[in-house]
């Protein structure tokens, strides 16, 4: 779970008693609560389609990714996926951030945009993560026009996955693409950011990095013990300390119960 204020800044310092968790509208007892800068497993999904040439967006995105990697710690791990009309796993999980920086630096833009396929590949790869905290970071300037997978297929896979997705897209270039990204990201408890230009990428990359380091981890044993494979809807409610502005909670929308 992450918490932000009305202008998008992450919020730290909250305690267990400030949170309530509901599963299918039934309040659950929070058995586990922690906030600490734990190691992270991150997949970077990088748009290298032809439109990334415009406004030198490819260079700005490379610099932002390098910035994110340079802020890591030795226990973090990363992989890199690039996409145009083709989706490529450039680097599988590694703790050598310098290797990933080199891979990013050599990317050249061209082709169409298979964003759904790239996210699907990222969701598949993240299953091999070694760390409890997992995230995918999508950087794109457009909308899908070349995928084999559909929006509904990717969204369904995201519902099954224990990972938060963060999406950054350029505001002025996204039409339906904005809806596409929000539709997938929202269900995972991640966040979307739509800066007016990629000149603002560093700010949002820093925000994502800080948020990943300062997330709250809440755990509970469901009162519904039935192993029926059905979707269980989760809602996290915040009772913030007095004096704070209205805060926004970002948490995954639910999970599928195991089957017996």
Regions found by a protein language model. Give the residues of each.
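Scaffold/interface architecture of coatomer-like assemblies
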Residues: 2-260
